[in-house]
Amino acid sequence: MGLDVLTIPIQLTQAWFYLHYAELTGYELNLERDVAGRPLDETKTYIYDINEKGLRPAEQGDINANHIKLLRVLATRSIQTIAQIGGVEKILPEVWLVARQHAAI
């Protein structure tokens, strides 16, 4: 299920794939700590740091707690489970971009 189900947004399937691909190649995205090693804070916003391959706090960041929650679900759940989650379309473009940048594809 995923690529053959037209009701699942292609960006959702791709983001799921990118995160799992990065994990399989040994570069799992840290969704618990920022690039400085501090725990992620739900009140802060972040940007993806391509050089450090992680999230960096930034006042003008476009990644917030909701994006991080979806990234965590993508990294730990099956595409069948994720497809049942509603309301992700609003944050999916940013999540897709982070996953794609992290996988370096």
Language-model features, listed with the residues they occupy:
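Non-catalytic alpha-helical scaffolds and adjoining flexible linkers that form interface surfaces
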Residues: M1-I105
